[in-house]
Amino acid sequence: MVTLNDIQRNPHINMFIQRSKEALSFYHYTDHGFDHVNLVAKRAKELAKKIGLSKREQELCAIAGFCHDMGNFIDRIDHEYWGALLFFEVFKDKIPPKDLSLIMQAIANHDNYKAKVLSPISAVLILADKSDVRRSRVIIKNRKIIQTDIHNRVNFAVTSNKFKVDPKKQRITLQLEIDTDFVPVMEYFEIFTQRMVQCRRAAKFLDYKFGLIINNFKLL
């Protein structure tokens, strides 16, 4: 059985992630490298465990989380599909077809806002990925340059990110602290509305509700 540890040691996967980080850094994008994918993998596995998925499903969620952005080095556009195809090429002879298809599906759907959530693996990955907004994802250190891009501004403004799961209330909550001196809360919604809609859909698929709290104010 292939595990997350096996995936993390695979030279092809590591190179794809490194190249993707370099490609997006060239355009001053937020971090999509190892810090991001390791956090998403960890968050996905923890979420899967808390909502009661099997140990194998937990591992599939973690694997999908680690590999979800590795198609960016080919092209940012449709990177989710490139990532799924790359995963197939590397592991088609190493992972059972059912598990392989679930991971590929999750990778392919994670950044497609029009796609329907079709499995718990996909739902968990969406929630783990779209909830990762934080200052440390901003690669650029020059504040003047940061101010020129709304994605960098919003991520830089987030000083605290807490992802909470309450199985009893069946509620998943993203709690953020935002420096409103750097960016108004409304700018968060300018770029993250679609992502929050995705999170709500994903949570609903899991029979959970998704909540958003910013600066101790409940918005969802």
Describe each model-derived feature in a short phrase.
Residues F26, K49-V165:
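Divalent metal-dependent catalytic cores for phosphoryl transfer on phosphate-bearing substrates
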Residues M15-E22, E89, Q105, N109, ...:
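Charged/polar, solvent-exposed surface patches and flexible loops
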